[in-house]
Structure formats: C-alpha cells, structure tokens
C-alpha cells in the first residue's frame, strides 16, 4: 500500500486556494491535497491580506509548523511558487521537518525575479491588461463590476507582496526541485532553469502546451506529470532511507 503524501498547494496572485480543490478527485488517494488559503480571500476573507513577502512567508511557517505531516511536498503556481520557496527556506531556518520536494509552476527562479514589474502594475488599467494577457480569468469576472473590483484589489495587494521580494543568496535547499512551464508563457526557459541553483538535489523542468495557466489548459497531461514527480520524490526518500540505514 502506498504511504500517504500531503501536497500543500499555494495559490497564484489574485486567487483563492480553492483553485486546487478539484485536484482531490484528479489525483490518487495516497496524495492528500491540502490547499493553503491566504489571508483576505476564500475562508479567510475577513482577515487583512499581508502586503510583505517576508511577513507572509513567516506567517505561513507559523501556521504550518505545529502540524506538519511525516511526508509532504510544497507546490505553488506563479506567486504561490515564490511563496512555497520562502516557506521552504523558512522551515529550514527553523530546523523544522522539511518537505520531500518543492514543486514550482509558472514562476521564474528567485534569482531571476523582476520585482519592479509588479511595482509598475498598481493601476486598474495595468492590472486588467495583465489579467487579460495571462488568460486565466473567466470572462464573467470582467463583465461583473463587483467581482472585477474584488479581483483587482486582491491582485494589487498580491503584486505588492511579489514586488517586496528581495533575493538573498541563501544555501541551496537539500531537497529536489521540480519546475513546470508553459510553452507560450512569457517566462523564458533560462529564468525557469535557474531554479536548479536553489537545490543540491535533483532538478527537473517539464514543459506544457499553453500560456501562464498551462496547468488548466493542459490539465490531463499536467496531472499525469505531477503525479509522476510526486512518485519520484517518494522513491528518492525511500532510497535515501535505505542508504542511511
């Protein structure tokens, strides 16, 4: 019988962790999908959203540490990937139980982040243009002024979080990093490849048809590859255990 594995999932900018709920029926039962909701959205709508990358990642570590499972993986898409990296580094600094892998989707490596890009997109017009370009927002959001206002306000705050990120050359993580990219996304292969610099272990980069939201546009294939990477991570942990025994 497969030993259980918890998959913690962090959302992209302007979104709720509910974007991952459907994964619970798309992935096998040995994978427990645990979406991590951020303040100011979804079930935490009544909380003030964080506006600092450092404060948000520290808060996420505070929430996770008391109940970390035996085997878990951190996954994030876009902003969520950058947060997942910060959480992994924060857990390492606290000498907490580490994830068996870090999975980063649709996000340039920490050393290749363009913080100024986010700082330049604070007006409604700039945010709407960015949403339209990325293609992940339903048309009904653009057609409903109330929904659009909520989305823009949240996206603006999330972009401030991304804009506050400052890269520091911390020790590479001693866990595998698996990166995922869209062939039609604006993020170049070089910026995705540099995730390899953040790990002393296995690094992979998988490509999918689609733009920034390739994980929806190529969902079936993405789910297949995601499951494979999770299985690979379990095997690496098992092999390491045998070697050290």
Each model region followed by its residue ranges:
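Non-catalytic, mobile gating and regulatory segments of ester bond hydrolases
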Residues: 1-245
